[in-house]
């Protein structure tokens, strides 16, 4: 069980977001952290991805070994083989954890408490939380609240009843990664916020419908952008989906805007679709001093949903839908 942090709410200043986008707390750049406690414990019996520094769990913050992440080449899953079985298994595990952590989202709970609970869920499955130690990322998931587009770092800020929060998580198990995310609505979110979240969820489904053997990657972005614009939202172009399997991030890069990608999908292609929709016409984000958190320039809210998909001989399977 998570310990409620409702009494802490008064310790955090409520900064009102731009009124034209609704009623919600704005997260300012000054709330960024630049140092962190030691990473959460992971048993040595659990396999870790190669990018995790050898001394990540034993050295102080900023003292970790530098691990170069080489530029990855596109990979395909061998259909009908052990690789397909493993990637399906870990993707399902990721969705199970997301569903479970979503039930714990409520006012007063801190994102750090959510991260701790999620970490324990993943470890209990014998899996590793892929973000932990990736380029020395300090937590096991990302939590992006209101005007934060992506890569928010879990901290001690309690959730407010007017918040929306995206939780993005990835598991590493049996040599493969499973990646998914969702945006959750708290109890007092206004209609503009709810409309944004629902539109983003639908935009993901529209992107999935553009997938299949022989279909063009660029059509995913075209369909998503057209849908978003029709509903009065913009799409952030600073983040993309990505190929995934044995490697956390590799080509193809899945753009959620109109683009000129000439690639076509083939059976065995495994990748994520993860559009970030933003209120208003300015979708640009600015990076906070923590080097990770990206928040909207305009102060508008952003929402994101993500699925991991696998192209098959006759269509597309959504591996993180259960």
Residue locations for each model-derived region?
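Active-site neighborhoods and metal-handling regions in enzymes and metal-associated proteins
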Residues: 2-322
């Amino acid at each position: 069980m998570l310990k409620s942090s409702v009494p802490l709410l008064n310790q955090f200043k409520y900064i009102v977001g731009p009124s034209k986008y609704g009623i919600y707390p704005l997260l300012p750049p000054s709330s960024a952290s630049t140092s962190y406690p030691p990473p959460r414990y992971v048993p040595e019996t659990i396999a870790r991805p190669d990018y995790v520094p050898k001394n990540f769990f034993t050295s102080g913050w900023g003292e970790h070994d530098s691990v170069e992440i080489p530029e990855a080449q596109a990979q395909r899953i061998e259909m009908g083989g052990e690789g397909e079985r493993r990637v399906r298994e870990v993707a399902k595990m990721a969705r199970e954890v997301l569903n479970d952590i979503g039930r714990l989202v409520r006012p007063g709970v801190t994102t750090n408490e959510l991260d701790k609970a999620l970490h324990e869920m993943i470890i209990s499955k014998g899996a590793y939380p892929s973000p932990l130690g990736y380029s020395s990322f300090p937590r096991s998931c990302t939590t992006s609240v209101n005007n934060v587009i992506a890569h928010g770092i879990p901290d001690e800020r309690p959730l407010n009843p007017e918040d929306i929060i995206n939780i993005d998580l990835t598991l590493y198990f049996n040599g493969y990664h499973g990646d998914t995310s969702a945006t959750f609505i708290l109890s007092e979110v206004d209609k503009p916020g709810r409309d944004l979240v629902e539109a983003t969820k639908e935009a993901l489904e529209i992107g999935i419908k553009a997938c299949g053997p022989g279909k063009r990657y660029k059509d995913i972005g075209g369909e998503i952008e057209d849908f978003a614009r029709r509903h009065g939202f913009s799409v952030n172009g600073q983040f993309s989906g990505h190929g995934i399997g044995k490697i956390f991030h590799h080509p193809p890069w899945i753009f959620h805007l109109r683009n000129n990608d000439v690639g076509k999908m083939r059976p065995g292609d495994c990748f994520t679709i993860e559009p970030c929709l933003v209120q208003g016409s300015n979708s640009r984000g600015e990076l906070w001093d923590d080097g990770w958190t990206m928040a909207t320039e305009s102060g508008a809210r952003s929402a994101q949903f993500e699925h991991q998909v696998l192209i098959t001989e006759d269509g597309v399977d959504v591996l993180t839908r259960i």
